Curated annotation (Swiss-Prot):
Membership in a protein family: Belongs to the bacterial histone-like protein family.
Domain of life: Bacteria
InterPro entries for the chain: Hist_DNA-bd (IPR000119), Histone-like_DNA-bd_CS (IPR020816), IHF-like_DNA-bd_dom_sf (IPR010992), IHF_beta (IPR005685)
One CC-aspect GO term: cytosol
Organism for this UniProt entry: Escherichia coli O127:H6 (strain E2348/69 / EPEC)
Database matches in SUPFAM superfamilies: IHF-like DNA-binding proteins (SSF47729)
Protein name, per record: Integration host factor subunit beta
Task of the protein: This protein is one of the two subunits of integration host factor, a specific DNA-binding protein that functions in genetic recombination as well as in transcriptional and translational control.
């Protein structure tokens, strides 16, 4: 599901709320989450999961075109850990 599809589905389900208001709310929420992570803070949504930053240590990689070794710097990357309720709902085949 894309952001546009999410907005469209929410606007359809909440027909009493203008679609533009739904779009603004979704965009504001995602922007706030991104800026919170950029500040190094953790986000926890009970029953859904948590977002945090994980550190990737410096390492030697390879250029996929040439095969040459490339030194990659350490960096922080976003990480999502699903909550138990989300894991249970997603486990429809188990």
């Amino acid at each position: 599901m894309t952001k546009s599809e999410l907005i469209e589905r929410l606007a359809t389900q909440q027909s009493h709320i203008p679609a533009k208001t739904v779009e603004d709310a979704v965009k504001d929420m995602l922007e706030h989450m991104a800026s919170t992570l950029a500040q190094g803070e953790r986000i926890e949504i009970r029953g859904f999961g948590s977002f945090s930053l994980h550190y990737r240590a410096p390492r030697t990689g390879r250029n996929p075109k040439t095969g040459d070794k490339v030194e990659l710097e350490g960096k922080y990357v976003p990480h999502f850990k699903p909550g138990k309720e989300l894991r249970d709902r997603a486990n429809i085949y188990g």
